[in-house]
Amino acid sequence: MDNDGPRSMTIGDDFQENFCERLERIHNTLHSINDCNSLNESTTSISETLLVQFYDDLENVASVIPDLVNKKRLGKDDILLFMDWLLLKKYMLYQFISDVHNIEEGFAHLLDLLEDEFSKDDQDSDKYNRFSPMFDVIEESTQIKTQLEPWLTNLKELLDTSLEFNEISKDHMDTLHKIINSNISYCLEIQEERFASPIRHTPSFTLEQLVKLLGTHTETTEPKVPKFSPAEDILSRKFLNLKKNIPPIEKSLTDILPQRIVQFGHRNITNITTLQTILQKKYELIMKDYRFMNSEFRELKVELIDKRWNILFINLNHELLYILDEIERLQSKLLTTKYTKDITIRLERQLERKSKTVSKTFNIIYRALEFSLLDAGVASKTNELAQRWLNIKPTADKILIKSSASNKIATSKKKIPKPKSLGFGRPNSVIGTITQDFQERVAINEGDSNKTPENSTTVALKGKKLGKALLQKMNIKPATSPNSSNAINPFFDPESPNKGKLILSSVPPLPYDETDETTLRVSRGENEKSPDSFITSRHENKVQITETPLMAKNKSVLDIEKDKWNHYRSLPSRIPIYKDKVVKVTVENTPIAKVFQTPPTKITTPNSQVWVPSTRRRTRLRPPTPLSQLLSPREGRLDKTPTY
């Protein structure tokens, strides 16, 4: 270390290397003393030479520390370098302070070992000569330690000061300065994007978009960026991100950092005012950049929010002015000149549509005024247009009310015929009538074409000839349907007699043609007739039915089913009867039938009282006891009691 005066101190590389080596040897020697368990020469490294080296290092450091922490020798020019050096060697210096406080503990352990050696009974003449100098080194080192402790307190204060200075200057201020500079760059980037096309131009929008955008505003929120395109949406997101970064910077820079600088100035070291002044100057530089960032952010906010909202509503005021002029012209046209009904209706519709647009636009502007989105100039212009609209509106309302009343009267007098559809649900008779009319029209056209020009009293138009040629070219034929399709179909008949009735049966009451008795007999299928005669008679009956109009009556499905049941009920049964003669003879010859009583079968339900009879083996049923045996005389029954 070279001293160049009372106010300057230079820490050279040689001094740093020598000083750090001594601190390291002091630490290693204390560690060896604490780990030593015996002073035997063969097992320990503790010797007089080691203790003498420890004493020399401790004495040298004790001579340097006072000059290092002397309040008078801390120069203003070198104070930052000294703070950096303390910060660089902080771990070694804190370790040295801890070692000095532990010297007494290490020496006490060494004295215990020496006492153990002298308490032994062995006759070692060199023991006193070997251990006696150690007592002198311990005593002298203890004295140096006592002299060094006050300077170590000052050294610890300097180390704490350097740590706090580094935290405020580098960790807090430098980091905050970097964040501010990055936000300034981000703000300038957003300004460049805002000036790009088409964002710098007047935004194009609809009233629905404007209403939706105003719906996102509330009385507590700040105005938002008017965005009507994807590019404006991206720009709005970037602006919001920049806006979120500013409050933490402002809180840290205006509230936290000044208090830390003031608290740092309360430390009791030499030239602390110099260090505080350095921090204050650095703080002023950061505040300068912070003010520039705020000014750029406010300009960006004015460009993106305030000016764009003003331009937007200035354009709305221009549109309102043009629309009000058009409404006045429409009113003068409708009041001074009479036009045809079609033109009058068109003009009234234009007046109604423009009146609604004006009212809706004023409602939007007044809602924007509630959120303070307009400046005083735009608001005053809007108020002038609103007063003009109040003067025009009564006349427009009077015209529209009169038009609405006349339209209602015309609508009530006009009869709207019911459209006739040719599609699904139309009776076949109507379709047949239309087809017949079409056929007659085609026949008339063909008759006209066969006439000569002399016989024809009228000259055929060119369009009719062209239509006739197209019909012949396309080969269009009229749609015809059989007469059977004219029968009533209850599923598609709009005038069905079953309409309005509650039908509970699964089969709807469908009408069918009744048949006579001959057809009924044929349908029953008598066994005497052959298949050929059956087909012939059926054909004849069908001819008779079609020729007789009185047989075309309707009969429901239920009546037909009833007749079918009555018919089959009158016929004899065709189920074969099986006659078991062997069983019958056995029953007649057996004087008494043996009845086997078997236990009842299992009841299906707990409450059932029905027992099912069964045989013992459940393979076949026994024949019943003849009635003659059951009604035989008492004596006969006693003799012929069946065995169970």
UniProtKB/Swiss-Prot annotation:
A biological-process GO annotation: karyogamy
Chief subcellular location: nucleus
Highest taxon, organism lineage: Eukaryota
Biological function: Involved in karyogamy. Component of a cortical adaptor complex that orients cytoplasmic microtubules. It may be involved in anchoring cytoplasmic microtubules to the cell cortex.
GO CC annotation: cell cortex; cytoplasm; cytoplasmic microtubule; kinetochore; mating projection tip; nucleus; spindle pole body
Cellular localisation: Nucleus; Cytoplasm, Cytoskeleton
Alphabetically ordered keywords of this record: Cytoplasm, Cytoskeleton, Karyogamy, Microtubule, Nucleus, Phosphoprotein
Basic and acidic residues bias spans: 523-534, 634-644
Protein name as annotated: Karyogamy protein KAR9
UniProt miscellaneous comment: Present with 656 molecules/cell in log phase SD medium.
Region (Disordered): 506-534, 606-644
UniProt-listed Pfam families: KAR9 (PF08580)
Positions carrying Phosphoserine: S496
